[in-house]
């Protein structure tokens, strides 16, 4: 039995609050159980130097955790004077995931910056950030269309992510912190919805306590696929409002 009483494949309660702040073109508070991440999308004219003159857009991301988003306070990275390796890894993952879902040639020479700020961390912050950033990005793109900056929606499909892992020899989906801390295997899976199916954008998997078998890998991917299918349904529902 999991600490929350969930079954192996069961997600934590998932909610999206759109337009959470009023200034950004897209602003979404995403909540996976007790994990809460504020995701905003900002549209700026112009692109990085390496894309100038190509009539292509760009998507980038930044990720941070508030000092008391965790059990013990940690100093802001801005005070330390540099970003940590974990932060850089996560924000690059977020950016890669969302770029894979957008036809940058249809974006024009605009840059969309996704800011993902963890308000409270209870496991799965990077997967929550990707999932929430996708909804914020959709809102920003819709606003660009309304303002006449885009002729069509460049989004190829929804993007979502979920954590899976092996805890006590059992494969489970959507790990909370207490599970993640003792997991023998920890994996993050990012997918895009294409038609009625789903395709993998990225997999990050590590044997934390013990190596995992090929069979366990297949079990984890199946759990992730099923969980992300449910997340896509939740994204669609909130975007219809």
Swiss-Prot record:
Pfam families: RNase_PH (PF01138), RNase_PH_C (PF03725). Keywords: Nucleotidyltransferase, RNA-binding, rRNA processing, Transferase, tRNA processing, tRNA-binding. It is an enzyme of class 2 (transferase). One of its GO terms (biological process) is rRNA catabolic process. Phosphate binds at residues 86, 124-126. The keyword Kinase does not apply. The keyword RNA-binding applies. GO terms for molecular function: 3'-5'-RNA exonuclease activity; tRNA binding; tRNA nucleotidyltransferase activity. Gene3D superfamilies: GHMP Kinase, N-terminal domain. InterPro entries: ExoRNase_PH_dom1, ExoRNase_PH_dom2, ExoRNase_PH_dom2_sf, PNPase/RNase_PH_dom_sf, Ribosomal_Su5_D2-typ_SF, RNase_PH, RNase_PH_bac-type, RNase_PH_CS. It catalyses: tRNA(n+1) + phosphate = tRNA(n) + a ribonucleoside 5'-diphosphate. Its EC number is 2.7.7.56. Homohexameric ring arranged as a trimer of dimers. Belongs to the RNase PH family. Phosphorolytic 3'-5' exoribonuclease that plays an important role in tRNA 3'-end maturation. Removes nucleotide residues following the 3'-CCA terminus of tRNAs; can also add nucleotides to the ends of RNA molecules by using nucleoside diphosphates as substrates, but this may not be physiologically important. Probably plays a role in initiation of 16S rRNA degradation (leading to ribosome degradation) during starvation. This is Ribonuclease PH.
């Amino acid at each position: 039995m999991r600490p929350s009483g969930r079954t192996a494949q069961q997600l934590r309660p998932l909610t999206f609050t759109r337009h959470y702040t009023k200034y950004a073109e897209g602003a979404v508070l995403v909540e996976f159980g007790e994990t809460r991440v504020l995701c905003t999308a900002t549209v700026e004219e112009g692109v990085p130097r390496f894309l100038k003159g190509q009539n292509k857009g760009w998507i980038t991301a930044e990720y941070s955790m508030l000092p008391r988003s965790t059990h013990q306070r940690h100093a802001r990275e801005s005070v330390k004077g540099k970003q940590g390796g974990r932060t850089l890894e996560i924000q690059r993952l977020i950016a890669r995931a969302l770029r894979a879902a957008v036809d940058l040639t249809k974006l024009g020479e605009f840059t969309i910056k996704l800011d993902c700020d963890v308000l409270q961390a209870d496991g799965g912050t990077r997967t929550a950030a990707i999932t929430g950033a996708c909804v914020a990005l959709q809102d920003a793109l819709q606003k660009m269309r309304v303002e006449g900056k885009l002729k069509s929606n460049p989004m190829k499909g929804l993007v979502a992510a979920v954590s899976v892992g092996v805890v006590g020899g059992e494969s489970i989906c959507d790990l909370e912190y207490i599970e993640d801390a003792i997991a023998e295997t920890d994996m993050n899976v990012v997918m895009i919805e294409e038609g009625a199916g789903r395709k993998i954008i990225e997999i990050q998997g590590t044997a934390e306590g013990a190596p995992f078998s090929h069979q366990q890998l297949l079990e984890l991917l199946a759990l992730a696929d099923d969980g992300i299918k449910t997340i896509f349904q939740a994204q669609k529902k909130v975007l219809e409002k």
